[in-house]
Curated annotation (Swiss-Prot):
PANTHER family: FLAGELLUM-ASSOCIATED COILED-COIL DOMAIN-CONTAINING PROTEIN 1. One of its GO terms (cellular component) is cytoplasmic vesicle. This is Flagellum-associated coiled-coil domain-containing protein 1. It comes from Rattus norvegicus (Rat). It is found in: Cytoplasm; Cytoplasmic granule; Cell projection, Cilium, Flagellum. It comes from the Eukaryota. Residues 124-220, 278-328, 355-385 form a coiled coil. Residues 52-77 are annotated as: Disordered. Residues 61-74 have a biased composition (Basic and acidic residues).
Length: 411
């Protein structure tokens, strides 16, 4: 037999209640001495050795729902099985209890004083009885495990059938709902079309009536306008004849006076305009020459910057083969150069706009100089474009060299 009284079988534990306290088997009898034979003590008639009393487990406390289930299972009806004479098995959903009587060991008690029982229960008989009981218990537990598995399979099959039924119901209901929704939409569309037709017809009738009224009012207005126009023409023709006589006399006097005033004003204004035109012309020419010099100076600076950039490019190509850390500083300098070039592009665009506005105001004498400046501007644009293309080529080469430099370091 097992020396430990706690035996736990995982094959039958559907509610995960953990180990249970099984029956305590009697310890092996001590070896009897030759002189005084020692008989095993009679087993006390206590009510039950419960298999299902839970040991003090170190696990965390169960949920309240599980404790309620345990209480309900304790109240559930139990089944009594008499395995052998003097050995009763009581089981329910949650626990198994065993009752051992005196009949199991077939002992005879003698109440006479000084006389010991002559019947001696051998140790091998007790062990064989207990082994038989354990085999019967294991068979019962295996049967219960089989029953539990079959019940679980039945429940799973029922759940599958219910799920299939629910899916079919859901599909049929969804189809019916879609059909009803489609029919309702069609009804609403038809009703909406009918109402639109009715409203359209009513609106068309109103438009026809209003058109007729408008034509009638228009004809009446034209007639009234013609009558008023005739009356006004008669009145104005009379007054006009009178006014023309008076105005002729007054006009002649006023025209003579105004003629003298206008001639004096015109002479003064013409002199002032000539002076202003000369001043503005001189200022425009000065500004034009100044801006031209600035543009030429900026163009020379751009050429110098391009030469410096080319030199820097050669230096960078030489340094990129040996150093990878200098790339960050060169990238920043390139970024600043790009910003400066973009600023210069914007300045060149602004200057072009100013040139166009000022050259439009200048006279035809300076058309040749304007053409020269436009040609210079075009050349500047081409150079700027070449600069941008050179920068793109330089960036591509720098990217290629930067991608090649880590490979060099890895090698």
């Amino acid at each position: 037999m097992y020396p430990n009284p706690l035996i736990y079988c995982t094959c039958w534990d559907p509610w995960n209640l953990g180990p249970r306290k099984l029956i305590k088997t009697p310890h092996p009898l001590p070896k009897a001495s030759i002189r005084k034979p020692i008989f095993p003590a009679p087993i006390s008639r206590e009510p039950n050795y419960l298999l299902s009393q839970p040991a003090k487990s170190t696990a965390f406390p169960r949920d309240k729902a599980q404790s309620r289930k345990l209480e309900e299972s304790n109240k559930a009806p139990s089944e009594v099985i008499e395995v052998s004479p003097g050995y009763k098995l009581v089981r329910n959903r949650e626990q198994i209890s065993v009752t051992l009587g005196d009949e199991m060991f077939s002992r005879k008690k003698h109440l006479e004083s000084g006389i010991l029982s002559k019947v001696k229960i051998s140790r091998s008989d007790i062990i064989s009885d207990l082994e038989e009981q354990i085999s019967e218990l294991s068979a019962i537990i295996e049967q219960m495990n089989r029953d539990h598995q079959s019940a679980q399979k039945l429940l799973s099959n029922e759940m599958d059938l219910r799920c299939a039924d629910m899916k079919q119901k859901f599909e049929t209901e969804s189809r019916e709902l879609k059909q009803t929704h489609k029919e309702q939409l069609e009804k609403l569309e038809n009703s909406y079309k009918e109402t639109l037709k009715v409203e359209k017809a009513a609106a068309q009738e109103k438009l026809d009536e209003m058109g007729k009224e408008y034509k009638y009012l228009k004809n009446m207005f034209h007639m009234y306008q013609d009558s008023i126009y005739d009356e006004m023409e008669d009145k104005w023709s009379r007054r006009k004849a009178e006014w023309e006589k008076d105005e002729k006399m007054e006009r002649e006097k006023i025209l003579l006076q105004q003629k003298h005033r206008i001639t004096k004003k015109f002479e003064l204004e013409s002199e002032e305009e000539k002076r202003k035109m000369n001043e503005s012309f001189s200022t425009v020419m000065e500004n034009f020459t100044r801006e031209k010099e600035e543009l030429i100076r900026q163009h020379n600076e751009d050429i110098l910057q391009m030469q410096e950039l080319r030199k820097a490019k050669e230096i960078l190509e030489a340094e990129l083969r040996t150093q990878a850390v200098v790339l960050e500083t060169l990238n920043t300098s390139l970024y600043h150069c790009q910003i400066e070039l973009q600023r210069e592009k914007t300045m060149a665009g602004n200057l072009e706009k100013l040139f166009q506005t000022k050259l439009a105001e200048a006279e035809e004498k300076y058309k040749s100089t304007i053409q020269v400046l436009t040609e210079e501007n075009n050349s500047l644009r081409q150079k700027v474009l070449t600069i941008s293309t050179n920068e793109e080529i330089f960036e591509e080469r720098s990217e290629k060299s930067s991608s090649a430099s880590p490979n060099i370091y890895e090698s």
